Design a protein with these regions (language model features):
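Short aromatic-glycine-(Arg/Gly/Cys) micro-motifs in beta-strand/loop hairpins
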Residues: 14-37
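Short, charged/polar N-terminal "headpieces" of proteins
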Residues: 1-19
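Mixed-charge, Lys/Arg-enriched low-complexity segments
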Residues: 32-93
Length: 93
């Protein structure tokens, strides 16, 4: 199974596995100087809760790329992003 959104792709190792391979969206600078967003290197063999934590951390980092934030701001954003991910199943109801 594959779970994919705009900023990540998670692929289950096998149908009965609890482990996932994860690709996160990364900003890369090409040799010609253009900047592109593309899925980065694969992180192998993560349980689903670790996949979610890495997605949240990546989203926070991308949203605050060129600025410093406080620990409180980081934790507030962490909570908001985790709620968004956790509530995806509720959005269809």
């Amino acid at each position: 199974m594959i779970i994919q959104e705009d900023d990540f792709k998670a692929e289950q190792l096998s149908d009965d596995s609890i482990f996932w391979d994860l690709n996160l969206l990364r900003t890369k600078k090409k040799r010609d100087g253009t900047i592109v967003d593309e899925l980065g290197d694969t992180i192998y063999g993560l349980p689903l809760d670790s996949v979610m934590k890495r997605i949240v951390a990546n989203r926070i980092a991308r949203n605050n790329k060129d600025k410093a934030i406080t620990m409180k701001q980081y934790l507030d954003e962490w909570k908001q992003e985790m709620v968004k991910l956790s509530n995806l199943s509720l959005s269809d109801k």
